[in-house]
Swiss-Prot record:
Transmembrane segments: none
Residues at the catalytic site: 58, 69
Name by which UniProt lists this protein: Tryptophan synthase alpha chain
CC terms in the record's Gene Ontology section: cytoplasm
Subunit structure: Tetramer of two alpha and two beta chains.
Organism: Arabidopsis thaliana
Family of this protein: Belongs to the TrpA family.
Enzyme category, top tier: lyase
Amino acid sequence: MDLLKTPSSTVGLSETFARLKSQGKVALIPYITAGDPDLSTTAKALKVLDSCGSDIIELGVPYSDPLADGPAIQAAARRSLLKGTNFNSIISMLKEVIPQLSCPIALFTYYNPILRRGVENYMTVIKNAGVHGLLVPDVPLEETETLRNEARKHQIELVLLTTPTTPKERMNAIVEASEGFIYLVSSVGVTGTRESVNEKVQSLLQQIKEATSKPVAVGFGISKPEHVKQVAEWGADGVIVGSAMVKILGESESPEQGLKELEFFTKSLKSALVS
């Protein structure tokens, strides 16, 4: 493991990318759903992902109407909610686990739960839990001002998403406003595993890189070591793997088996980035 990463010196998303860039490395960013199969397994999974060399971990907060998510993550959210997982229980778990991690956590959540709690209160709660980043996929750029202001006030990096169908002017505005990194959605539609990565990603990466020096991470449909390697070769600063991770944890015969498979899979992705 990287000697620069110790639990007591966990830094934010921007600093993580800056460190990796100075080392000529690409960030591995796994995504898992909190509470699937249960929160105790989520806590163990976060530690496994961290120990296998993940650079940032996205943790999905289960929601009953997840518009951006494909079947695997929707099913994970349903299973988690049926178990009684809620925001407070996720925060309690994170308060215990985050001090033991060497990589930062970014929460992936929908806007409604933030609004219900109140934006300022939400930011205070996640900051106190040790969270460094936030992704809210269902908020259009025009409505992010309050979120961005409160996030900045609480030193939470609000990551914005851009897609292959985003017009260039709008993409530039998203790139300008995004903090931590820019999330480039590799394909149109919802999350999920795919056979290959959309080749348009390469030119989109070039376009974004021309507009900014901020790091760009690619996600949606990336599920194999060869996908990870391909996207890194195209010039991405980070690679996000979600549905494949979620399926391993949520659909294994037992939580223990899921954690073993998760470790093996994460190591295979990490190897693809360093080879």
